[in-house]
UniProtKB/Swiss-Prot annotation:
Cross-referenced PANTHER family: EFFLUX PUMP MEMBRANE TRANSPORTER, PTHR32063
Protein name: Efflux pump membrane transporter BepG
Any Pfam family hit: ACR_tran
Region of interest (Disordered), residue spans: 1050-1074
Classification of source organism: Bacteria, Pseudomonadati, Pseudomonadota, Alphaproteobacteria, Hyphomicrobiales
Domain of life assignment: Bacteria
Function per UniProt: May contribute to resistance to some drugs, such as deoxycholate, sodium dodecyl sulfate and nalidixic acid, in the absence of BepD and BepE.
Amino acid sequence: MLSSVFINRPRLAIVIAIVITLAGLIAVTRIPVAQFPDIVPPQVSVTATYPGASAETVEAAIAQPIEAQVNGVDDMIYMSSTSGNNGTYTLTVTFKVGSDPNLNTVNVQNRVRLAEANLPQEVTRLGVTVKKQSSSFLQIITLLSPDSRYDELFLNNYGVINVVDRLARVPGVGQAQSFGTFNYSMRIWFNTDALTSLNLTPNDIVNAISSQNVQAAVGRLGAPPMTDQQQIQLTLTTQGRLTDAKQFENIIIRANPDGSSVRLKDVARVELAAQSYDTIGRLNGKPASVIAVYQAPGSNAVAAAEGVRNVMEQLKQSFPAGLDYKITYDTTVFVSSTIHEVIKTLLEAFVLVVVVVFIFLGNFRATLIPTLAVPVSLIGTFAVLLVLGFSANTISLFAMILAIGIVVDDAIVVVENVERVMAETGLPPKEAAKQAMQEITAPIIAITLVLLSVFVPVAFIPGITGALYAQFALTVSVAMLISAINALTLSPALCGVFLKPHQGRKKSLYGRTMDKLSSGIEKISDGYAHIVRRLVRMAFLSIVLVAGLGAGAYFLNTIVPTGFLPEEDQGLFFVQVNLPPAASQSRTAAVVSEIEADITKMAGVADVTSVTGFSFIDGLAVSNAGLMIVTLKPLEERLKDNITVFDVIAEVNRRTAAIPSAVAITMNLPPILGLGSSGGFQYQLEDQEGQSPQQLASVAQGLVMAANQNPKLSRVFTTFATDTPQLNLNIDRQKALSLGVSPNNIIQALQSTLGGYFVNNFNTLGRTWQVIIQGEQQDRKTVEDIYRINVRSSHGDMVPLRSLVSVEERLGPLYITRYNNYRSASIQGNAAPGVSSGEALAAMAQVSKTTLPSGYGYEWTGTALQELQAAGQTSMILALAVLFAYLFLVALYESWTIPVGVLLSVTAGLAGAMLALWITGLSNDIYAQIGIVVLIALASKNGILIVEFAKERREEGVPLEQAAIIGARQRFRPVMMTSFAFILGLVPLVIAVGAAAASRRAVGTSVFGGMIAASAVGIFLIPMLYVVLERVREWGHARILRKPLYEEEKQEKADGDASGPTVPPTQPEDRGLS
């Protein structure tokens, strides 16, 4: 027998355990640390610009051609795009979890290339960018000038030139990006009146710059081939691209016959300024450059953040005077706090388990064995997780906490059986260990396989939910496998070394005290056996009880709200500020500053970073929107004053509700960063029949109004609207052509004056920047300024646009969004207080069903999509777990009926779990479902050993009811030991506060309630079910095969039935528990 080798050679078992532990400790130093496994779907972004174009023009000219080609690219889940009134286009394609981001990028690039032939020339000239996108925030860094000596232009470009690229090279950083639009550009601000007086047009400026600001490659002198012996070879250089404003000022626009010339400085103001002024960054009211740092997939978040901090400290040494930086948000602070709290919970659970085991065993030496064996299993698990490419995260650590109850049971089974053999036979520890292992080796292996059959199938579920389950299931499975190895090697070896023979033990005060405690436990065991004796005589009632428990669990499952993952206090939330359509940037900035100043004074708030001119919800720059990133003080500090992120959000909502000129929308971070932009649900209303944007907006507003009247929904909103004031230019094309003016020249003149026209590039500061021409401020204020623009006809005459265009006012969309190749309106919302996210999604679906007209549909996206997919998989998960457990139990018992009893006993635990969730008001989310899977395993394990002992006695010829009583009596002590240890180990989860408290309570509550029910009800139900099903089995065997299943029962067993259990309670000193 394998265990005998290690009992005789305990140092070999100890060495194996040390090697496993060392491997785990080494892995702990190398394994990536993150809040969650790598479950954020990879994304690829496509960006393009059509300067001066409206949202509808961008959609028609860019979005539709590109999305028609990209749609259906390999591994795509969904795609969404935004076409803005500022001429920008952004498409985000989201792919399946586990797909290769690089391959995704190549596939999208190939599809976009097919669409480029259908794009406007101006768009392709500026370039269509395709790149993989990191969506998992790591940190937000702001560059600021405490003494206000630097403006936004300097701060933004200092960050772009000196900080962003350096941060992008930090190991573990996937992307570093500046939120600002103040990149350097050579801005040519021309004066329309000056151009008119000199008989020039904006196109003349464009042509002059294009011809004189060029990259020159003029060749070489003396380069081969040469017919004679050339002695020298020289490379020729000349003035190519211009590098500063003075050189651009001297560009010649027109050379006159008399030798005079018109230079750019005669008609325009030239300066090194910003490429775009669409957004303005602030930190606590002062100018700032905001840099977002994203984590690379699969990297160590904590190590990457530490690397960023180190690099910023290095860069700070070379900062000019008056420049500083601040890390205004760091996700790893929450991650580190979460990991710290979970590890603390793990240690607390372990200590409580050890205390319970000590109380039940009553022997310090015996307690020492599981105390040593359990850490080996848990620490060794890290080594396997590292090899599998997993990270140390909340899921894997939760799995270890829950695995303690399973892992400790293996060691308890060994120790308890060795103690029992020593007490009954008087054998010395080594011999007793050998005999005990002969009895339990097969059950340990079989039970391990049965439990693996519960967990392993869960690991094959696809998608994000499947990735969460896989991390959990594989962590528990690895811990169980190592625990089984320990139970066959380390635990029996330690029993042979640590335990003492029962004969001749001296009774100290401590020993006598523990004897009394053990005697009390024995009396409880006798009482339990007495109750079981009565119950098995009414075993048929177990079927009624199981039916009642099953019905109760089912009913509770229908009324307990469902969810995806609980929202947490991550120390940060967003505030989106929206002003009326067409509100100017300066007007928006004033309102943002007012709200910013108010929030900064609130209790618990540390910093407020604002980006005026940016809509976080829509993901584009708009003049009437602003974003505020509110960073809170450390959670430990806020908890002293009982302030959570939800309290601050509620206060912000209350204060901003009184602002008449704006609407403020507060958004907590989503449970998984990178999966959705905020908490709550994300919904896409789709126009599936190509109606107008105005009709889509009308339907969206009607849907939002109906949703907000539903009591299960709150703060449902959409920012999509078509009431933005716009001016529509009608070009008289016939008249223009008759005067020799090309409509294309008219459009280019308008674009150059009003929209900002990209001419070409220039080089300075080691970078390449854009050259942009645009009219001066006074030339683009009113409609009258449009009429003053001139174009040149083919005859050389100057033609004012007043004679070629007319202007009319109209209302139109500020932007247009598309989802999966349909024009769409993005709608976001939240569950009402006390309502789960699952109920909110169901309510929104019902509102959609009754409200949406024909031709309109909807799709869920972000966390809502994942939650619905998870909800659809829950039943499959439990069904797979139960099916595989049943099949392995059939193999264990060589019976098709006995395993049914073991599995039916789990209904008590399921009912208890659902009842606990209902009482506490928690949702049946992924964490709760993870706990229920563990509950199935642990409750099954208790039933397996009770039934195994009863089955062995029955096969020895003991009467059926008596065999059930003996099996229950023999396993009562270790079952209660494991159950109490596990239940007490869950207490730190159930009462958790601090980082990830909602997650810890979610995962702990279901198992806590389930194990209480399984311990209080299941231990009585299991022997009853065994009697019923074994009786059916034997009856069927006798009727079908016409012979008894077992040999003739021994008469002495039957005689003992009247006097109680065959194994009478022994005195504590006989059991060796002193």
